[in-house]
Amino acid sequence: MKKFKVAVLANLKVNAPKFEGMFEDQWDDLDSEKTVNEMVEAIRSGGHDCEFMEGNLTLVEKLPKYKADICFNICEGYYGDSREAQVPALLEMLRIPYTGSRVLALALALDKPMTKRILHWHSLPT
């Protein structure tokens, strides 16, 4: 069996930015250190090299240096309307394969009015 270099990409709750006026549940969709550590250990137990990387701007420098064969992406992102699509966009620019939905699917899913227009165009109920 081929040994892969896998990068687990996630946004940890503990590292999430805090700002005045944020909702109490602002970062409920982010991951715990326990979850990410268990994922990394599960991949390593399969005989693969695996490293966790926080899904933020540091990826721009870290990913090319690590030379991952594939990224296990569970990033939610921190900023912007299409925050969930940001890391996949970076991975596509770097030409690194990744798990999960592609950029367009994520961006559309987060843009409810555009999603409704597309569904309406195809005569699908919303």
Located regions from the model:
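ATP-binding N-terminal substructure of ATP-dependent carboxylate-amine bond-forming enzymes
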Residues: 1-99, 103-104, 108-110, 114, ...
